[in-house]
Amino acid sequence: MASFIWVQLKKTSEVDLAKPLVKFIQQTYPSGGEEQAQYCRAAEELSKLRRSALGRPLDKHEGALETLLRYYDQICSIEPKFPFSENQICLTFTWKDAFDKGSLFGGSVKLALASLGYEKSCVLFNCAALASQIAAEQNLDNDEGLKTAAKQYQFASGAFLHIKDTVLSALSREPTVDISPDTVGTLSLIMLAQAQEVFFLKATRDKMKDAIIAKLANQAADYFGDAFKQCQYKDTLPKEVFPTLAAKQCIMQANAEYHQSILAKQQKKFGEEIARLQHAAELIKNVASRYDEYVNVKDFSDKINRALTAAKKDNDFIYHDRVPDLKDLDPIGKATLVKPTPVNVPVSQKFTDLFEKMVPVSVQQSLAVFSQRKADLVNRSIAQMREATTLANGVLASLNLPAAIEDVSGDTVPQSILTKSTSVVEQGGIQTVDQLIKELPELLQRNREILEESLRLLDEEEATDNDLRAKFKDRWQRTPSNDLYKPLRAEGAKFRAVLDKAVQADGQVKERYQSHRDTIALLCKPEPELNAAIPSANPAKTMQGSEVVSVLKSLLSNLDEIKKERESLENDLKSVNFDMTSKFLTALAQDGVINEEALSVTELDRIYGGLTSKVQESLKKQEGLLKNIQVSHQEFSKMKQSNNEANLREEVLKNLATAYDNFVELVANLKEGTKFYNELTEILVRFQNKCSDIVFARKTERDELLKDLQQSIAREPSAPSIPPPAYQSSPAAGHAAAPPTPAPRTMPPAKPQPPARPPPPVLPANRVPPASAAAAPAGVGTASAAPPQTPGSAPPPQAQGPPYPTYPGYPGYCQMPMPMGYNPYAYGQYNMPYPPVYHQSPGQAPYPGPQQPTYPFPQPPQQSYYPQQ
């Protein structure tokens, strides 16, 4: 019986999975948390699992297959949880073609891609290949071996079929030949046919009914025939696959005919029995004559011949039944008991997800967008309240409130101004503002340098990629850096725009500070100096107990209450904390997609609805209070004495109140700017790391591709075939010499065999050949037969003598063999130690002289300097 076909495993290069995954985890999850530490440990375990599954030779055992399947399940599990792409987590996987053996001057074909889908396809190929090897190793003489073989062949068939359906969508370019859809489709058919063959062997071993066995064998023959047709025009599979499939198709068909003949005998159809046995004998004879190198069918052939001889004998002497033609026989039925095992993750029965608690990337992205929506809502509400408070402070400062109703004496500093002065001094005064403004350019420059360095890395790698693409043209098959870096460049442009806006904001802050610097400096002075700087005015004691002053104090008190409520509201808005992970995971499980916008808007309205309503109520209350304050202040102004000193004093007090408000706002803005630049530095450092990582990955990919191109170029012939010399096609040679086969670039070209030597001319007895004539070199290695001669070119009989004439002083001297294949066209460049001459010996016909250069002497076969491939 023919042997089973198994598939060689693909080989891969080592890849450090842990480093890029750990870096992503550290950037994504809070530092120092248990979650981050757990995921970092899982990344290390994943890297170890890859080395265990792919970094060592695997035994042909189900335990080794289980390790491969665990790694396959794990990379399928992490695919939706990490952003694997060339411009995010960039991992380049390099795999060699399983069927390409390479050459002496170049390794086997390999492909390097930054694609987890490519890694999945190659790992699944190895799972299928190892399953085929395990099945081929089984002992088919027991039920356990038959069961395991059938199971593994069906799994291998399903795995190859899965690769066929998914490989093109998983890769960004053409795959290597071994995982191309045509090749894996053929392998799937082969594995399915062998699984059916195992069921046929099981039925035969269990001595099931011949009708069932015939149907199983006929179906197996069909499967082998389909596989044979698929690989008929392919030269990528091992050379023994094609004849083995052809032999197995015939053997299975012969088995079907044999068991159907037994059924015909049982039904008293003796002529049909003989016809089927004859067909089976012809099939097996064909196998024995053409594929005996791959299969042994002697026992089965003897079995068929014995049955055929007995059937013919019985029919000739007893039944005399007519033997029908093969085409007149009823077709044998078919019964299939096999099908490709579908690949449903997890495939391994012992799989445990190392990143079980990590949410998918789609959920992470939805959470990021939700966080941005939440931050926008909170910031918008806080900004509205702060703008309203700034507006209220501006209105009060323009009305000189509350200083106006406190300054009834006209010659002391109002208490509100003293409070503001104390606050400014406690916060550091103008020295604080000057220091904060001084730090801004340094922070800005640091961020610009990080951004420019990041973009410089991209520019340099892109320039190198463009140069190599221009040099190698279509051979440079990888994603152009210009296309790959578009998201990063867009992100860099966004950062540059942010920095430009920050510069404008810094300028506005500095301008406002310069316009209020002198007044802020006045607030920093001690109370006596401050009082001296404020003009005095006539007392207005008559207004001390007036109703309008009481109304203004009440309104100002209400306004202060609103400001305090806003501080509480701001804290409430900032402190709200809740997790949308469970809601997004539920939506993903139910619908397969996440409608982030609908879920986020609904949840934000539910949580922040009450707080945003309070913000709007606060804004409306303030609007009403400011109107009432302005009306009451008009009445207050009418009651005050109108003189120049009072007006001047009020103007100074207004400026001091305005300066305080500006000081508070400036300090807040500058601190916020400093915080902004520091946070932006962290973001830009991560951006720089991302750029550095992708550039490093691209350089690694570039080096691999350059190495492959060098090997590919080394395998190419360096020149076209050289035409043979004219004499080789001359009619005088007696036959035409075949043109030489083009040699590889690094191999010496094979020399064509010269034509037969013509008969030597008859020279006068006293004519001696010149001493400079060269003798034919001695043969190298074993002797070979002389070239065939035509009757017309056979030399006449000659007297026998020594093959090489000698000098009288050197009897019997033979020239040492050349250290290389002799080249008659370059003889003069080698200095021989003893140049031999032709010397006519007694009784020997003379050798031809140098006047016949057209016919070089026959030369021994040349030995190449390099091992033949």
Curated annotation (Swiss-Prot):
Chain segments carrying region Interaction with TSG101: 717-720
InterPro entries: ALIX_V_dom, BRO1_dom, BRO1_sf
GO CC term, one of those recorded: melanosome
Localization annotation: Cytoplasm, Cytosol; Melanosome; Cytoplasm, Cytoskeleton, Microtubule organizing center, Centrosome; Secreted, Extracellular exosome
Family matches, as Gene3D superfamilies: alix/aip1 in complex with the ypdl late domain, alix/aip1 like domains
Entry PTM: May be phosphorylated on tyrosine residues by activated PDGFRB.
Phosphoserine PTM sites in chain numbering: 481, 730
Tissues and organs where the protein is expressed, per its UniProt entry: Ubiquitously expressed. High expression in choroid plexus and low expression in cerebral cortex (at protein level).
Main location group: cytoplasm
Annotated spans, Interaction with CEP55: 798-807
Region annotation (Interaction with SDCBP) ranges: 383-869
Region (Self-association): 503-869
Phosphothreonine modifications at: 479, 741
GO molecular function, a single term: SH3 domain binding
UniProt entry keywords in alphabetical sequence: Acetylation, Apoptosis, Cell cycle, Cell division, Cell junction, Cytoplasm, Cytoskeleton, Methylation, Phosphoprotein, Protein transport, Secreted, Tight junction, Transport
Name of the featured protein: Programmed cell death 6-interacting protein
Taxonomic source organism: Mus musculus
Gene assigned in the entry: Pdcd6ip
